[in-house]
Amino acid sequence: MTFETAEGLADQVLKFLSDKLETNYRVAVIVVGPPGSGKSTISEKLCHEINSRYNKYLKESGSRPHLQENLNERIDLCEGIPKFEEKSLHDVQNGFFNHVQDQDFQPKKFVDKNDGSEVVVGIGGLPNSIRVENVAPLEPSNHDYKIAKIVPMDGFHLSRRHLDHFDDPVEAHRRRGSPPTFDSNNCLQLCKLLAKTCTIKPTLPVNKTTADTGTLFDKISDTFSESVPSIYVPGFDHALKDPSTGQHCVDAFTRIIVLEGLYLLLDEDNWRDIYPTFKDTHAVIVWKLDLGVDVLEQRVAKRHLQSGLAATLEAGVERFRMNDLINALRIKEHCLAADDIVSISNK
């Protein structure tokens, strides 16, 4: 296991994107680790470093990104996802609780008549839904472009109302955060959509050729495309203690997606298909974090205390041992193995 700085990780990711730029519109980075391993911190620092470099390039070069108008080349990301029958839409709008423990349920879609976007729904209903829009993204008003974005797994926590419909709702609430309490069906469907965008081939403006010289950031700025749909991803509202739809957006300006979560390498149910889905794109880097239990315990216990989930540090430790530690051991014992999964540390 090697210690990596945000600067070093950013160098690796940008080199990888440079190698893939002629064949892959975007690349994916999967960051996996148990509670307290620092995966969120690493992901945030990585994206901040990459975005800072890109915006510094724009400022110093005096250039602006070029968003190609390819409106006649719209990409149907949701092709192949079955549609809800009209009679089922009432159930969707009123909770959609009947499939909450069905790990084999295939997500379905419907068209939002208000804006024409497609909404993809799994076992968690609308709170865990994905929205896909074929609309050109707006340029940021402050010109703060984010070519790297985090896509967290947290938005696929089943809502508390959905946990109420488990066969054993008391146990479901007690073990919230364990694999069965996630909408893994729609999380996998999101990964399939994102992987599909990775395989889109970038196109250069008509006045450019592959022989033109330039930096990586020059080439990125020249190959943004309106034809790449925007994908709205649920997040988690800690104040409400429930998922929140559309909290994150992966749009045409996003060239690096950083997926972070506990179970993205878990060799169980729908989770086990996430890594192969991205592996098939030939455009993914996978980092796994693993620290000693003592370090994890102290980090998570302090986090529980600071967030109000525990009244004392001792209560935070107890909460860690009753839930987080069980999840951490499950990840360790049932983790997919592959030669290209790299172990890193942020001690």
Swiss-Prot record:
It comes from the Eukaryota. Signal peptide: none annotated. The keyword Transferase applies. The keyword Transferase applies. InterPro entries: P-loop_NTPase. ATP binds at G33, P34, P35, G36, S37, G38, K39, S40, T41. Keywords: ATP-binding, Kinase, Nucleotide-binding, Transferase. GO terms for molecular function: ATP binding; kinase activity. It is an enzyme of class 2 (transferase). Its EC number is 2.7.1.-. Belongs to the YFH7 family. ATP-dependent kinase that could be involved in endoplasmic reticulum membrane assembly. PANTHER family: URIDINE KINASE. This is ATP-dependent kinase YFH7. It comes from Lachancea thermotolerans (strain ATCC 56472 / CBS 6340 / NRRL Y-8284).
